Amino acid sequence: MGVETRRAIHAFVLLLGCSLSVSAQNWKQVGPPGGDVQSLAAVPGNTRTLFLGTSDGHVFGSRDGGDHWALLGRIGEHHDDVIMSMIVDPRSPNTLYATSWTLSSHGGGVYRSADAGHTWQLIGLEGLVVRAIAQAPSNPDILIAGATDGVYRSEDSGKRWFRISPEKHEDLRNFDSIAIDPHDPNTIYAGTYHLPWKTVDGGKNWASVHQGMVDDSDVMSITIDQNNASHVFASACSGIYHSPDGGANWTKFKGIPKDSRRTVHILQDPKRPATVYAATTEGLWKTSDDGANWRLITPVSWSILSMVIDPENSDRLILGTERLGIQMSDNGGETYRASNQGFSHRRIVDAAVDPQHPERAIVVLTSNFEPMLETKDAGRTWTPLATGLTSGPPRHIFASPDGWFAAPGPGGLLRYDSAKSSWMPVNQVTEKSAPTQSRNTASVKKVSTQSTNAPASKATATAMTKATAPFHAKVNDMAFGQNAWYAATEEGLFASRDHGLNWTRVALAPAQQGAAVSAVNSAAMRAVRISNGDSYVWALSSKQMEVSGDGGRTWMSRTLPFEPRGQLHLHPQDEKTVVLASDHGVFVSRDTGESWHQASLSELSIDDLAPVRNGVVVSTAKGSLFLSRDGGKTWGPMNGPDAEGSLSALRSREVGNQLVAASATEGLFVLEMGAASSASADSIPASPTAQQ
């Protein structure tokens, strides 16, 4: 539970003198499996025990060689620590070291865990970008870390650190890789953004060792042959290099295409020294003849971020990838299998669930390579749904009674055509008036003493023509009724009566002349909902709520009790009672929006809202959940899924009474609400203050 929530609940408890109990609820993680594996480490000599680090500070572990994974702990406080490297102390399988840098919180440094990854302590180089760490094989008390501003050394397992590279040196900075001679802890190689460097006296003196390398090479990895310390490998932007003489001279390997030259790691087979692997951003490459010939042994689309070779069975390869999680091979890279059970760490932007089929769900990811995944079997398998998407991951995804709808970022609306297995655009229909030819309205001549020829009068008839074009407005929300579907967009409210194929703008203001009417009809709409019988429709703009009690034919405007800055979510409890969730907390109206009462969650910023059977659930910006069973009058806290940070989406299914929560980084979770929705819990009453 976040600090924000604890403060709010503490204030309520002091005010009301009540104690809050939390009903036990069991959330089930259903995927999608995989994610970014930034770093991998194994207990030396035993790859049954593995650890992986992510790009947001999470540490997972496996005790069965990677077949099953569990979240162990987290590094940092703001969920933006990129765990660049991890090592396990050869003297103790419970002692781990990790280095990190942060995306925005000015953190980073060297961390240590003494309990196998469950808890972590910052032990040095606080606030620095630390991308590499190495432990001296001949003296494990010695640690060498490479940071943005230099190389640091510890001789007491990380208790104290001191700089061993010249301060403010023009080239000895921005370190990406560190390697220590297996027999001499004072012989150290360090790779920078600009070529490799070497010291043989523990850092007193440094020499640039780049003879034979392309100048200006960013050295990302350095590996020393454990059987022959003068035999060194290095990878750079310009390619992969080998030195037979301790870095004095380098020869570039041939055979790996230029496109795959960004090699993150080089690993030597512990049993076959002539076999070397190059983990690149475009697949894993292998040589069995000391670099004379190379071949690609994974799909080129795989980006390999980390790798471990089993020392007992060197045909067993464990790959940490971008997006795809852990991929394993038991035959030296001939075939692979995904091994992500318990590791679901995809970045979910939005999610939708089939309201009638508990086994169907879809998630939107941040990856352009794999922007959407669908499951039809409750998360056991996931299938990409990308065909027809032309602008990357959509902003939102919606579940209609007939299937999925996606709202692309630039605007527009797509429906998924399961027959064509593709996303298809929908149409916007506009009506325009067009004058017809003049016609005679008088055909009977009247004769009088004043006139002998009365001319026939003429009139201009107005006809309405329909024009069809691709739907282009940015969609913020959708609602699906029995007879009409609605889309709340940045350009107004739209309705469809043909299952979403064609959409027309809804006239919220009376049909009369004037710019004010046009402004109302085209105002940005943030949310929309429909009553069960389709008679009532609610649509929210940033300033007011539009209400229709006759299926959208006529509308009434209701003023909101605040000026929202962030998201708005709406839940009509019945035709009179409406729950409104926002960054100002929760408000309730029991007279169709004419007056509002602020609920007890006024101090919390609400991210999402989902109705459940006999209740409604809201999620806060910190990922906490609250449940109301009386239309928003009182609220009680719920246990959320075991995920840190915010929830990117909160959805519900009527069938099975399920609540579905999408974690921003830790996958999709499902809660059976049968017991939870009927259990009793102390609640937080609504505020007695009414706002008109």
What residue ranges belong to the model's regions?
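Extracellular glycan-interacting surfaces
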Residues: 12, 22-692
